[in-house]
Amino acid sequence: EATANADCFVEVSGILNAAAINLIKVSDDLRRLAMLGEIKLPAVQAGSSIMPGKVNPVILESVIQVGIKVKANNTIVADCAARGSLQICEFMPLLADALLESIDLLIAASGMLSAHAEKIEVNRDRCLERLAASPEIITAFIPRLGYDRCTELVKKYEQQNEQTVREFLENELGKETVEKTLSPQNLMSLGHRKEN
Protein backbone atom coordinates (compact mmCIF):
# COMPACT_ATOMS: atom_id res chain seq x y z
CA GLU A 1 0.00 0.00 0.00
CA ALA A 2 2.76 2.46 0.93
CA THR A 3 4.43 2.21 -2.48
CA ALA A 4 1.45 1.24 -4.63
CA ASN A 5 -0.92 4.10 -3.90
CA ALA A 6 -0.27 7.80 -3.52
CA ASP A 7 -3.83 8.84 -2.78
CA CYS A 8 -2.86 10.47 0.53
CA PHE A 9 -0.73 12.92 -1.47
CA VAL A 10 -3.63 13.54 -3.85
CA GLU A 11 -5.80 14.41 -0.86
CA VAL A 12 -3.23 16.85 0.54
CA SER A 13 -2.81 18.40 -2.90
CA GLY A 14 -6.58 18.79 -3.13
CA ILE A 15 -6.61 20.74 0.12
CA LEU A 16 -3.79 22.95 -1.20
CA ASN A 17 -5.79 23.39 -4.41
CA ALA A 18 -8.78 24.61 -2.40
CA ALA A 19 -6.54 27.09 -0.57
CA ALA A 20 -5.18 28.31 -3.91
CA ILE A 21 -8.69 28.81 -5.26
CA ASN A 22 -9.58 30.90 -2.21
CA LEU A 23 -6.45 33.04 -2.61
CA ILE A 24 -7.33 33.62 -6.27
CA LYS A 25 -10.89 34.61 -5.33
CA VAL A 26 -9.82 37.02 -2.58
CA SER A 27 -7.15 38.59 -4.79
CA ASP A 28 -9.55 38.99 -7.72
CA ASP A 29 -12.14 40.59 -5.42
CA LEU A 30 -9.56 43.05 -4.09
CA ARG A 31 -8.48 43.92 -7.64
CA ARG A 32 -12.08 44.66 -8.60
CA LEU A 33 -12.70 46.78 -5.51
CA ALA A 34 -9.53 48.75 -6.31
CA MET A 35 -10.66 49.26 -9.92
CA LEU A 36 -14.01 50.56 -8.63
CA GLY A 37 -12.18 52.97 -6.33
CA GLU A 38 -13.68 51.45 -3.17
CA ILE A 39 -10.27 50.54 -1.77
CA LYS A 40 -6.79 51.96 -2.23
CA LEU A 41 -3.96 49.48 -2.64
CA PRO A 42 -0.52 50.31 -1.27
CA ALA A 43 2.05 51.06 -3.96
CA VAL A 44 4.89 48.54 -4.03
CA GLN A 45 6.64 49.67 -7.19
CA ALA A 46 6.55 52.45 -9.76
CA GLY A 47 3.09 52.57 -11.31
CA SER A 48 1.94 52.52 -14.88
CA SER A 49 4.23 53.94 -17.55
CA ILE A 50 1.24 55.43 -19.37
CA MET A 51 -0.98 56.42 -16.42
CA PRO A 52 0.79 58.58 -13.82
CA GLY A 53 -0.28 57.87 -10.26
CA LYS A 54 -1.83 54.49 -11.05
CA VAL A 55 -1.07 51.75 -8.54
CA ASN A 56 -0.74 48.41 -10.26
CA PRO A 57 -2.10 45.46 -8.24
CA VAL A 58 1.14 43.53 -8.57
CA ILE A 59 0.92 41.71 -5.23
CA LEU A 60 -2.61 40.55 -6.01
CA GLU A 61 -1.57 39.48 -9.50
CA SER A 62 1.38 37.60 -8.04
CA VAL A 63 -0.88 35.75 -5.59
CA ILE A 64 -3.27 34.87 -8.43
CA GLN A 65 -0.36 33.44 -10.43
CA VAL A 66 0.71 31.37 -7.42
CA GLY A 67 -2.85 30.04 -7.23
CA ILE A 68 -2.78 29.09 -10.89
CA LYS A 69 0.55 27.31 -10.42
CA VAL A 70 -0.74 25.39 -7.39
CA LYS A 71 -3.81 24.34 -9.38
CA ALA A 72 -1.50 23.09 -12.15
CA ASN A 73 0.59 21.24 -9.57
CA ASN A 74 -2.59 19.59 -8.29
CA THR A 75 -3.10 18.14 -11.77
CA ILE A 76 0.51 16.92 -11.82
CA VAL A 77 0.07 15.22 -8.42
CA ALA A 78 -3.15 13.52 -9.52
CA ASP A 79 -1.70 12.35 -12.83
CA CYS A 80 1.47 11.02 -11.19
CA ALA A 81 -0.56 9.14 -8.56
CA ALA A 82 -2.81 7.64 -11.23
CA ARG A 83 0.12 6.35 -13.28
CA GLY A 84 1.59 4.06 -10.66
CA SER A 85 2.14 0.49 -11.89
CA LEU A 86 0.85 -2.33 -9.71
CA GLN A 87 2.85 -2.06 -6.48
CA ILE A 88 4.99 0.98 -7.22
CA CYS A 89 4.43 4.62 -8.10
CA GLU A 90 7.28 5.41 -10.48
CA PHE A 91 6.28 9.04 -10.75
CA MET A 92 6.74 9.84 -7.06
CA PRO A 93 9.70 12.21 -7.68
CA LEU A 94 7.62 14.53 -9.87
CA LEU A 95 4.64 14.17 -7.53
CA ALA A 96 6.75 15.11 -4.51
CA ASP A 97 8.35 18.04 -6.33
CA ALA A 98 4.95 19.46 -7.32
CA LEU A 99 3.47 18.95 -3.85
CA LEU A 100 6.41 20.52 -2.02
CA GLU A 101 6.47 23.43 -4.47
CA SER A 102 2.77 24.06 -3.84
CA ILE A 103 3.34 24.14 -0.08
CA ASP A 104 6.24 26.59 -0.42
CA LEU A 105 4.35 28.82 -2.85
CA LEU A 106 1.21 28.96 -0.71
CA ILE A 107 3.17 29.80 2.44
CA ALA A 108 4.93 32.66 0.64
CA ALA A 109 1.80 33.96 -1.11
CA SER A 110 -0.35 33.83 2.03
CA GLY A 111 2.21 35.80 4.00
CA MET A 112 2.65 38.32 1.20
CA LEU A 113 -1.11 38.82 0.79
CA SER A 114 -1.64 39.14 4.54
CA ALA A 115 1.03 41.83 4.86
CA HIS A 116 -0.34 43.65 1.80
CA ALA A 117 -3.95 43.50 3.00
CA GLU A 118 -3.07 45.21 6.28
CA LYS A 119 -2.07 48.32 4.31
CA ILE A 120 -5.20 48.51 2.14
CA GLU A 121 -7.26 51.63 2.78
CA VAL A 122 -11.02 51.79 2.38
CA ASN A 123 -12.38 54.74 0.42
CA ARG A 124 -15.42 55.21 2.66
CA ASP A 125 -16.85 58.13 0.69
CA ARG A 126 -16.71 56.20 -2.58
CA CYS A 127 -18.34 53.15 -0.98
CA LEU A 128 -21.17 55.23 0.46
CA GLU A 129 -21.61 57.07 -2.84
CA ARG A 130 -21.92 53.80 -4.75
CA LEU A 131 -24.27 52.36 -2.13
CA ALA A 132 -26.53 55.41 -2.25
CA ALA A 133 -26.76 55.19 -6.05
CA SER A 134 -27.45 51.46 -6.17
CA PRO A 135 -31.02 50.15 -6.38
CA GLU A 136 -29.62 46.82 -5.17
CA ILE A 137 -29.96 48.10 -1.60
CA ILE A 138 -33.66 47.33 -1.98
CA THR A 139 -32.60 43.69 -1.49
CA ALA A 140 -32.22 44.47 2.23
CA PHE A 141 -36.00 44.93 2.42
CA ILE A 142 -36.87 41.40 1.20
CA PRO A 143 -37.30 39.95 4.75
CA ARG A 144 -39.66 42.82 5.60
CA LEU A 145 -41.55 43.25 2.31
CA GLY A 146 -41.04 40.07 0.32
CA TYR A 147 -39.38 39.51 -3.02
CA ASP A 148 -42.32 40.54 -5.21
CA ARG A 149 -42.86 43.88 -3.46
CA CYS A 150 -39.13 44.63 -3.66
CA THR A 151 -39.14 43.83 -7.38
CA GLU A 152 -41.99 46.33 -7.81
CA LEU A 153 -40.01 48.95 -5.91
CA VAL A 154 -36.95 48.46 -8.12
CA LYS A 155 -39.04 48.87 -11.27
CA LYS A 156 -40.76 51.95 -9.88
CA TYR A 157 -37.43 53.49 -8.84
CA GLU A 158 -35.91 52.90 -12.28
CA GLN A 159 -38.80 54.78 -13.93
CA GLN A 160 -38.00 58.00 -12.05
CA ASN A 161 -34.85 60.10 -12.20
CA GLU A 162 -35.26 62.75 -9.53
CA GLN A 163 -34.45 60.96 -6.28
CA THR A 164 -31.63 58.93 -4.80
CA VAL A 165 -32.56 55.37 -3.90
CA ARG A 166 -32.75 56.28 -0.24
CA GLU A 167 -35.02 59.29 -0.86
CA PHE A 168 -37.24 57.13 -3.03
CA LEU A 169 -37.46 54.44 -0.34
CA GLU A 170 -38.19 57.00 2.38
CA ASN A 171 -41.09 58.35 0.31
CA GLU A 172 -42.41 54.85 -0.35
CA LEU A 173 -41.83 53.21 3.03
CA GLY A 174 -41.19 55.94 5.58
CA LYS A 175 -37.94 57.25 6.99
CA GLU A 176 -38.02 55.11 10.15
CA THR A 177 -38.44 51.85 8.22
CA VAL A 178 -35.61 52.76 5.85
CA GLU A 179 -33.24 53.79 8.66
CA LYS A 180 -33.95 50.61 10.61
CA THR A 181 -33.59 48.31 7.60
CA LEU A 182 -30.44 49.98 6.26
CA SER A 183 -28.73 50.31 9.63
CA PRO A 184 -25.28 48.68 9.75
CA GLN A 185 -26.47 46.41 12.58
CA ASN A 186 -29.32 45.07 10.48
CA LEU A 187 -27.31 44.75 7.28
CA MET A 188 -24.46 42.91 9.00
CA SER A 189 -26.64 40.53 11.02
CA LEU A 190 -26.85 36.90 9.98
CA GLY A 191 -30.12 35.58 8.63
CA HIS A 192 -33.54 37.16 8.58
CA ARG A 193 -35.25 38.33 11.73
CA LYS A 194 -38.97 38.52 12.19
CA GLU A 195 -40.23 41.74 13.69
CA ASN A 196 -42.29 41.65 16.89
Stretches with model-predicted labels:
Residues 1-196:
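Conserved, well-structured ligand/cofactor-binding cores
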